[in-house]
Swiss-Prot record:
GO terms for molecular function: FAD binding; UDP-N-acetylmuramate dehydrogenase activity. The gene is murB. It comes from Pseudomonas fluorescens (strain ATCC BAA-477 / NRRL B-23932 / Pf-5). The lineage of its organism: Bacteria, Pseudomonadati, Pseudomonadota, Gammaproteobacteria, Pseudomonadales. The keyword Lipid metabolism does not apply. Coiled coil: none annotated. Its EC number is 1.3.1.98. This is UDP-N-acetylenolpyruvoylglucosamine reductase. Residues 18-189 form the FAD-binding PCMH-type domain.
Amino acid sequence: MTLDIQADVSLKPFNSFGVEVKAKWFAQAHSDDEVREALAYCATHQLPLLVIGGGSNLLLTADIQALVLRMATRGIRLLSDDGQRVVVEAEAGETWHPFVQWTLEQGLSGLENLSLIPGTVGAAPMQNIGAYGVEIKDVFAGLTALDRQTGELREFDLAQCQFAYRDSLFKHQAGRWLILRVRFALNRVDHLHLEYGPVRQRLSEQGIEQPTASDVSRAICSIRSEKLPDPAVLGNAGSFFKNPVVPAALAAQIKQSHPGLVGYPQADGQVKLAAGWLIEQAGWKGFREADAGVHRLQSLVLVNYGGASGLQLLELARRIQRDIAERFSVELEMEPNLY
């Protein structure tokens, strides 16, 4: 066995909230073989397996009585290039933002709007991560996953992944599928998505009239850096709540009493509301109790000022959910996975 399995390991360095909990067993997988070793170890010792990547979408509320396997696989490959469309494959353990930067350095567009999102490549399809008008599903070309029940590899295409807003098949069947590598369809000719006003405004402020994909990436990085705290400095998991999608009638009702409501009409006739706006209107922006709080600049972000437990952060989140439900009749859904 080459897999190094350690006992009673602190997970504080492995979750972006910086919550102090321990894993009963912990290992890092650098290859497919080591992933299989972890599965075999769990089967032999009748242990559950929790697979993590960058730990940026986790809220850990108690010690983990399982083998925690951190995906540390590395590798990026060009699979095909017809001069316009390029298919790139990346291992699940690759850190997301450096991977995005690598694609831009190769002259490839498609991922620039997803710049500076924390986490790993393997976690990106699970959440169908998205930002500034682009989601993983828009650039997805396939993935390879390991069936934890049979040990067999399976290829998934776009339809099989069942992508939806911050959702996928893998989020609902995390106990079965373990994503090993992901493929992306990118372009040698820029097809930029500049629908969001703040991005266009930032480019205009920089005097850029004909932006490249790299220009868009830099603009988005500067916007995100201003709005979102660095987890290395202040523990957080990025946006904590999904933007709720509600019936148009409810959105209109809220707008009557709150004319400044921020909402985006959807193709199905519903309206996607800005969760951060709702939370700010309810007075939670900058709230702090002990070391658990809401960020002073971005109401969507819950923060750990140093000593908050996962349970304290969870209780704060639930208080916010209850308040928003009472004020606006809107149910907020948490983005991070709870353990």
